[in-house]
Amino acid sequence: RKRLPRAWATTFSTVFRGLPELLTLLIIYYGCQIAAQKVLAALGYEGEFLINTFVAAMIAFSLVFAAFSSEIWLAAFKTLPKGQWEACSALGLSKRTGFFKVLLPQLTRIALPGLSNNWLSLLKDTSLVSTISLVDLMRQTNLAVSVTKEPMFFYGVACLGYLLFAALSGRVFAYIERRSNRHLQGARA
């Protein structure tokens, strides 16, 4: 009963964790356009079909982020004792209520450090979207460098931009982690 969904999830995770992000981006952007063009041509439509670069980047990075995050959530699930489900059942909670009110808050607390690392990787991977002509920080930096011939200045500014985003993200995740662990502070003392 669970074999098919498990096989699909394992295949999805293996494929998108195994492919380089740039290759995934190029396959989604160019491959989907070519596939859609062929399907539409078979249906008699001879016009051009273009995928928006932002949409292609969003889909590609969502697939990669989902694949890596699925492993983090799986590990979080494996750390929860089986007694948690039993306790929810003993309290008369439905599976849905038990999951959302009891288990998910614990899972989120466990998964947050890994998810924050994934977020930082995703943040850095956004520099790859310049390869499909989506205007981003790196594309603007490369344009400025080609016009002014001052690579160190503009790449330094890009560095500061990415470091600023990473630092702000780190602060947000640190706050969320502190907030999700606040009930444990008294137990540690």
Label the predicted regions.
Residues R1-A189:
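Transmembrane alpha-helices and adjacent helix-loop boundaries
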